Amino acid sequence: MFYYGCFCSILCCCDSCHHSGCTAADIVNTYEEERLADIFYLYGELKNSRKLASVIVKARATRQISTIGDFLDIIKPLFGREREKKELAKVFQALRIEVNREMEALKEMLYAATEALKPGGRLVVITYHSLEDRMVKNIMKTGNIEGKAEKDFFGNVQTPFRLVNNKVIVPDETEIERNPRSRSAKLRIAEKIEK
């Protein structure tokens, strides 16, 4: 199920992470408890993020967490057997997102695309988890990541985009059968409009 090797490099999926020097091992061994909890809550959407962070901080006080095996031994008891695999996937997702700075990169790309597109140009984005999808949906509907609608004098929402599809596009059963990784994919399309 999981690779029990070095914890330092197993979660790094891109070269840019190596330039910043941040590894999953750095995160679990050095981040403050509150920051760890925030990462697990925001990026992994884990309800027990505070407890998870607390257990990690207590464990690392006695010795450094250096392998995935060490890490799993510490956190597995927090999850029930029936949900263990899903919950562990969320933990590793949160660490991967933090290591690779995925949310920051997506945010920068969305704002840059909003500025670069000319009226009539289309922004087409495929997301694979709810955090990404929320950001994309917000920028397409309101023009900002937070989803705060700016209104004109008459109360009309000011947005740089018009949604091309009212509903998000998801893979059908045939696509999922052919490509199981597509099951969580969501495609959103918006067209830049005149201001």
Give the role of each language-model region.
Residues 1-195:
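S-adenosyl-L-methionine-dependent methyltransferase catalytic core, i.e., the SAM/SAH-binding region
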